[in-house]
């Protein structure tokens, strides 16, 4: 600028679009230079006829496109100069502000300042602070700092103050300040308090903080403003140009032509003006440093660039622009890349001429790209300064629209836009990444829905076809879905994890249509499961060692997610036989997808391994395979099951989908499948390839006893395959029964299965749970009964070994998933009324022995799958599945050493708590709780679905109840004492970990403490069973005597218990469980009639085990009583609690075997405690903490 013209003072303080903001400007007043800075008050006259008013400078900026130097000020008038005039309400020092800020060009503002203001006599005349005193005591810097921070919005005004000091501004005779009314009051109050002190005290930090104002001018005038008014004639002033108001609010409108700006700003002037100061303050810091350089360049550039096209609008410029556009369009058309539509940049259509001119001034494309100055071009175009991709977008548009022409003009070779290529590479890389992610997600979603549909319609369209070909193929598909090679166990795990991630995206789709997905998955899975059952079902010799590694994998917290699912899948597989397992597997995959947050590890395999060291390992592996394969396998049983209860299956199947995805790769190769499980358990989703290989080799080295490759992904089936589960349960229960008979019993048809399991399972499971699993894998009817107890034993044994690790994982999962999933389908039975449960038990028992045995077991499997689904996710927390763990642990009763291998979750309907009686059980309980919580959504759906199933069908009426009632009655009879022991154990366990195991507690289970409680209860039950070595909830003798008898007795006991418990506040629970399990805890009639009749006096209860469990073994997971048990007053009653502990202590704290104790605890507690919620007092006493 010219020496005597307007000049900006100081560095720019902000940049916003085409605006560059400044802190001060200098002009000449009466031949002397004067500086006005932001926040300054000065006298002005808008016109020579207008009264004197005070202007507060709030914003200074330059519009680069038009080279306008603009200001925004707030005007204050004396009351007498306002239309209303002064009245008695106005103070002598009061001024009234104009409601709208005025936008004035600096040249006009300077004219306003040129006037005689000597007549102004208003305002409070404050004593000035003597600068000499300030200089002596060094308070001047403090004052300047205060003014800078308080009065200048924190902007750095040092340069401006220095300029002012050089000009002697501080000693200006006329200085006026307008305060807010509160500030004015505080100031006057402070002056009154220090009236006898020297004025320099106003510079004290405390005086300033209390409202003091240190004015260094000779004649400071203090006024205040507390009101505004609308000035009638201000708008008519020619100097005011609101059309130039900076658009700093709302959606950025970019730089618009003046006429447009007038239109757009005319109505927004006030709001824009009001925000000018603050907006500038915000923008100032943002652009202060960046603007200093760009500003100068941009000012020059834009002045030259845009002055021609816009400001200087000369014919020459217009002609140049027109000629450029004609030549550009012609050239681009000739090179067969015509410019059809000019894109928008920052909500404004690009001006090609402006862009070209700006680029040329900066040196052209190559120079701008090398210097990374595309943001400058963007600013030239008036783009949104807040855009984070402005530079890239500008460069891409330039490359596409102008770069070819620029090269043509310069005589350069018309390359295929080499610079554009990098840009395209960035774009394409990002786009590819996005596409890859999206496509991967879509692919997974695609595959899962496809699998669902295929499974529904035909077991092998794509995924189904692959699955039908082999479980391994299905695993491959899952692996491909997970985008990880299936050969390595680590790869499998990674793939599964990726699948989870992709499924996490897919969950949007699959969760939206979980039932559908699960249904289809189960449909195709059922057939594929049948194939797998044929392939692997008959081959119980799956590597038990590999399964054990899987269990370790399940123990891994990171891997706990899949393991949780896997155990439930394992349970389902066992219950539904291999077909059922595979059926659930597909759903497991979708569930995995739906819950991608959970690590795609495969602890469930570990659970299963624990369940049967020999067979359970195979079972875990089989379940892992099934978990993956079920998605692609579709057996007719699964098909039916899907048709019967697709919704329930969907929820669990989603959880299982995750597990299945995890286990799918394992299915491909038993060794591989197991390796992922091992990997999951051993590692929280992160495993070195070597470790994975080792696990894989271990898994493959030890043949899984049951061919189920994690074969039962019950969670998958539980939602969509609830019905299929019933059907599959009938078929699978036999094959699955051996491996996961307990698990199956825990399924929705758990009542029937529980009865059967309890009758034939106690001794069988205790003796050879692994053998039974193998046997029942082959034979489905028996497996229905034994499936639960055995499967529970497997989880129990598994949980015993993995309890601590699993519990850690479970605790984490519980915390993570307790909130996300507030419903646990596995506890649906808890929601059923006792009377209904009784009828259901009878119905289920009847059906179990008849055709319903296959259907409802399928349902049980579904429920288990639900339960497992939840547990599997929790197992990511180190607790695969409480229910499956319970079964595994019970199995461990017979093979306590082997049990550690099994860590797969059992059905949610199954008593998951029994799995957690030991420290390991505790871990499993946590795992179950976590997975259950994570699967809470799915399971909640399952709950509804099961509830529907349960009510319509006696067997189904208590999907949870089935597991609970059947197993519970047996469990009760099996563990009259053990029940108390289990209760005690449960309390101990609850202190350790309380996964959600109660059917009725399903929603709460999803919560943190409650869900864990139930899991603990179930774990304790399982532990108690393990101790007593009784696989089924009934007496070992009773169980041995006959599953049928146990089933009938269970039904009767359930009915009786239900009858008693119905009145006792456990209507919605499986009363048979409570009463048989806790004779001492409950009222004499209830406990004695229900429990004593079923359980031998010396029968060890899982609760008993629980009591000792936490104390005895860190592996033992806390036993979680079903809400029924809780409501029964087991825990609420001090006497009962004493009895419980007595029972626990007396009835073999450890029991004859951990497996027996686990088994007992699993069935009775799981069955007895279907209630969703324990009384708070009971919960607190039974479950002191959610975690170990």
From Swiss-Prot:
Any GO CC annotation of this UniProt entry: nucleoplasm
Sequence positions bearing N6,N6-dimethyllysine: 336
ARID domain ranges (all copies): 318-410
UniProt protein name: AT-rich interactive domain-containing protein 5B
Pfam families on file: ARID (PF01388)
Matches recorded under Gene3D superfamilies: ARID DNA-binding domain
Family membership noted in the UniProt record: Belongs to the ARID5B family.
Post-translational modification as stated in the protein's UniProt record: Methylation at Lys-336 prevents DNA-binding. Demethylation by PHF2 promotes recruitment of the PHF2-ARID5B complex to promoters.
GO terms of biological process kind: adipose tissue development; adrenal gland development; cell development; cellular response to leukemia inhibitory factor; face morphogenesis; fat cell differentiation; fat pad development; female gonad development
GO molecular function: DNA binding; transcription cis-regulatory region binding; transcription coactivator activity
Entry comment describing in which tissues the protein is expressed: Widely expressed, including in liver (at protein level).
Protein's cellular compartments: Nucleus
Organism, as annotated: Homo sapiens (Human)
């Amino acid at each position: 600028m010219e020496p005597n013209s307007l000049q900006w003072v100081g560095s720019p303080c902000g940049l916003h679009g085409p605006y560059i903001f400044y802190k001060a400007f200098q002009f000449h007043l009466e031949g002397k230079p004067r500086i006005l800075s932001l926040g300054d008050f000065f006298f002005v006259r808008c016109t020579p006829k207008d009264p004197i008013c005070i202007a507060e400078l709030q914003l200074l900026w330059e519009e680069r496109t038009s080279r306008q130097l603009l200001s925004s000020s707030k005007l204050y008038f004396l009351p007498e100069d306002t239309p209303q005039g002064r009245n008695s309400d106005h103070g002598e020092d009061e001024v009234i502000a104009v409601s709208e800020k005025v936008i004035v060009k600096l040249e006009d503002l300077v004219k306003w300042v040129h006037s005689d203001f000597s007549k102004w006599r208003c305002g409070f005349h404050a004593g000035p602070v003597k600068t000499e005193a300030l200089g002596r005591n060094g308070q001047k810097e403090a004052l300047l700092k205060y003014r800078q921070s308080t009065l200048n919005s924190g902007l750095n005004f040092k340069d401006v103050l220095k300029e002012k000091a050089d000009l002697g501004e501080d000693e200006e005779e006329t200085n006026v300040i307008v305060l807010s009314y509160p500030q004015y009051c505080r100031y006057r109050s402070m002056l009154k308090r220090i009236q006898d002190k020297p004025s320099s005290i106003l510079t004290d930090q405390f005086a300033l903080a209390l409202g003091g104002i240190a004015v260094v001018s000779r004649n400071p005038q203090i006024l205040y403003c507390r009101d505004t008014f609308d000035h009638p004639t201000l708008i008519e002033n020619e100097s005011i140009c609101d059309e130039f108001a900076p658009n700093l609010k709302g959606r950025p409108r970019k730089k618009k032509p003046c006429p447009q700006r007038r239109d757009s700003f005319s109505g927004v002037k006030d709001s824009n003006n009001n925000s000018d100061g603050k907006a500038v303050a915000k923008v100032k810091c943002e652009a202060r440093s960046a603007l200093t350089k760009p500003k100068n360049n941009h000012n020059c550039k834009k002045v030259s660039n845009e002055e021609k096209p816009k400001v200087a609008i000369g014919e020459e410029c217009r002609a140049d622009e027109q000629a450029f556009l004609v030549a550009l369009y012609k050239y681009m058309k000739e090179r067969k890349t015509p410019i059809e539509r000019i894109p928008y940049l920052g909500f404004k259509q690009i001006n090609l001429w402006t862009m070209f001119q700006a680029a040329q001034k900066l040196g052209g494309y190559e120079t701008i790209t090398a210097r990374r100055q595309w943001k400058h071009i963007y600013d030239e175009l008036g783009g949104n300064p807040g855009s984070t991709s402005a530079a890239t977008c500008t460069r891409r548009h330039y490359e596409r629209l102008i770069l070819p022409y620029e090269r043509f003009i310069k005589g350069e070779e018309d390359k295929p836009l080499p610079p554009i290529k990098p840009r395209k590479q960035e774009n394409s890389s990002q786009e590819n990444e996005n596409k890859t992610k999206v496509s991967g997600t879509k692919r997974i979603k695609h595959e899962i829905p496809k699998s669902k549909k295929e499974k529904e319609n035909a077991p092998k369209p794509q995924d189904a076809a692959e699955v039908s070909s082999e479980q391994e193929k299905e695993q491959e598909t899952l692996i491909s879905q997970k985008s990880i090679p299936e050969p390595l166990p680590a790869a499998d795990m990674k793939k599964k994890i990726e699948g989870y991630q992709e499924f996490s995206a897919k969950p949007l789709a699959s969760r939206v249509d979980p039932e559908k997905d699960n249904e289809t998955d189960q449909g195709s899975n059922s057939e594929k499961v049948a194939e797998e059952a044929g392939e692997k079902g008959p081959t119980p010799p799956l590597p038990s060692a590999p399964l054990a590694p899987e269990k370790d994998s399940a123990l891994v917290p990171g891997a706990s997610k899949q393991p949780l699912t896997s155990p439930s899948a394992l349970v389902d597989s066992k219950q539904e036989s291999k077909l059922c397992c595979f059926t659930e597997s597909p759903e497991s995959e979708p569930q995995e997808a739906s819950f991608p947050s959970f690590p795609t590890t495969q602890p469930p395999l570990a659970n299963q391994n624990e369940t049967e060291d020999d067979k359970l390992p195979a079972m875990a592996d089989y379940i892992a395979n099934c978990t993956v394969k079920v998605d692609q396998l579709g057996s007719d049983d699964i098909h039916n099951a899907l048709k019967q209860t697709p919704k329930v299956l969907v929820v669990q199947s989603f959880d299982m989908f995750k597990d299945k995805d995890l286990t799918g790769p394992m299915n491909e190769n038993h060794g591989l499948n197991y390796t992922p499980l091992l990997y999951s358990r051993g590692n929280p989703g992160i495993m070195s390839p070597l470790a994975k290989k080792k696990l894989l080799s271990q898994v493959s080295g030890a043949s899984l006893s049951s061919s189920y490759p994690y074969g039962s992904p019950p969670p998958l089936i539980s939602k969509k395959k609830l019905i299929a589960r019933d059907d599959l349960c009938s078929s699978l229960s036999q094959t699955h029964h051996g491996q996961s008979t307990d698990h199956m019993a825990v399924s929705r048809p758990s009542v029937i299965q529980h009865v059967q399991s309890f009758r034939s399972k106690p001794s069988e499971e205790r003796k050879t749970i692994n053998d039974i699993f193998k046997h029942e894998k082959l034979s489905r009817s028996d497996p229905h009964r034994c499936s639960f107890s055995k499967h529970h034993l497997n989880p129990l044994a598994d949980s015993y070994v993995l309890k601590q690790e699993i519990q850690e994982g479970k605790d984490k999962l519980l915390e993570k998933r307790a909130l996300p999933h507030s419903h646990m389908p596995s506890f649906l039975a808890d929601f059923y009324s006792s009377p209904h449960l009784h009828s259901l038990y009878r119905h289920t028992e009847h059906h179990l022995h008849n055709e319903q045995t296959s259907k409802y077991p399928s349902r049980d499997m579904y429920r288990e799958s639900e339960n497992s689904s939840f547990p599997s996710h929790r197992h990511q927390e180190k607790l695969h599945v409480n229910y499956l763990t319970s079964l595994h642990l019970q199995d461990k009763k017979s093979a306590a050493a082997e049990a550690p291998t099994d860590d797969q979750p059992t059905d949610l309907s199954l008593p998951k708590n029994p799995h957690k009686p030991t420290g390991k059980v505790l871990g499993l309980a946590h795992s179950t709780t976590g997975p259950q919580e994570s699967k809470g959504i799915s399971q909640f759906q399952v709950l509804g679905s099961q509830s529907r199933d349960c009510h319509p069908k006696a067997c189904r009426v208590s999907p949870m109840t089935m597991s609970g009632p059947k197993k519970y009655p047996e469990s009760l009879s099996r563990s009259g004492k053990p029940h108390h022991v289990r209760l005690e154990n449960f309390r101990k366990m609850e202190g350790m970990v309380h996964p959600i195991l109660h059917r009725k507690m399903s929603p709460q289970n999803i919560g943190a403490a409650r869900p864990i409680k139930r899991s603990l209860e179930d774990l304790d039950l399982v532990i108690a069973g393990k101790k007593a070595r009784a696989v089924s909830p009934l007496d070992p003798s009773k169980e041995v005597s006959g599953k049928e008898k146990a089933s009938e007795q269970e039904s009767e006991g359930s009915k009786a218990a239900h009858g008693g418990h119905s009145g006792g506040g456990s209507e919605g629970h499986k009363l048979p469980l409570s009463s048989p399990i806790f004779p001492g805890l409950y009222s004499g009639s209830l406990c004695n009639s229900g429990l004593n009749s079923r359980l031998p006096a010396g029968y060890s209860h899982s609760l008993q085990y629980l009591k000792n469990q936490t104390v005895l073994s860190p592996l033992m997971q806390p036993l979680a009583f079903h809400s029924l048990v809780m409501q029964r007053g087991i825990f609420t009653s001090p006497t009962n609690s004493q009895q419980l502990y007595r029972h626990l202590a007396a009835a073999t704290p450890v029991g004859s075997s951990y497996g027996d104790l686990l088994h007992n605890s699993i069935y009775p507690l799981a069955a007895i405690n279907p209630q969703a919620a324990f009384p708070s007092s009971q919960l607190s006493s039974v479950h002191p903490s959610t975690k170990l």
